[in-house]
């Protein structure tokens, strides 16, 4: 922050020296050098800024989503349009959001793109606070992070990403009304509008306004039909609301947009498979579950769902048991998966093992009626009928 205060006073050399000193501290190198690169941009030295980014790129660390936009705009100032496009496409891949797609389209059209990521010492200070919030997301409490993002927005009002992070933090704190208002503050004309609307739809759903949430997503589908993430998000919401046929249609559209299936795509096949299953289209669901496992063989959600479903159907029981055991190994404290294991053991006649695991599942999920009912069935099978009646 002091470095950016010095930048605001025009003491560029002193500021750069401070950023260098900060970069030598443990765990601060990438963060401090990013600030130094932005400082170079503020004074128009894009060559020096790109030197920092190119070195960071070699190490494979330190470039964030916002940092990727910064670098692309630096390359544009250096009249390296092709390099900017190649970098964005490689960094974001086929799952690039509307903000990145819009920038690539501008680059391909030859539009003049100014460097507008940092335009003053104040905005640079806002970048520091926003960067700290990003870096500390998995450690510090959301209240503290929200202070950083709100201050970042105050110092750098044009930093829409700080506003989006504030909305996300408010949502995670359960302040859905404030989160919706924050998402709604992103201008429709801004390339990040789609991300904001996706966030608003999720917040509306959690706020109990499901129909409004679906309407927001339907409008996005109409306006941005080529964005796979919108169709997948709509599919998830429709599936959660029990509208399985509509969910499958949304998932179908999203899957058709995948050029090459990769491990990260396991979820959408799993989600479509569960929707097929709820529609009693088991063969279609099974195909999706097995394909999801081919993409990510140790994905515990798929292993548990498929294993439990096979047990319920009385099919491939030993294989189903093996799947659930692998899921438990990945998530040893997940009560619902331990319940699946105990139930599979019960169905296979391994009653002693079933009792141990069902009791453990009830410890973890004491109020769940299905788990308690399963334990009752297991107790009955081993002759503990009084305890079984109590569980039922």
Residues covered by each model-derived region:
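Structural marker of alpha-solenoid helical repeat scaffolds
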Residues: 24-26, 58-60, 93-94, 155, ...
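Residue-level recognition of tetratricopeptide repeat
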Residues: 4, 38, 73, 134, ...
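TPR alpha-solenoid repeat register
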Residues: 32, 67, 100-101, 128, ...
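Position-specific recognition of the canonical hydrophobic site in helix A of tetratricopeptide repeat
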Residues: 7, 41, 76, 137, ...
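TPR-adjacent "capping" and linker segments in tetratricopeptide-repeat scaffold/adaptor proteins
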Residues: 113-128, 259-266
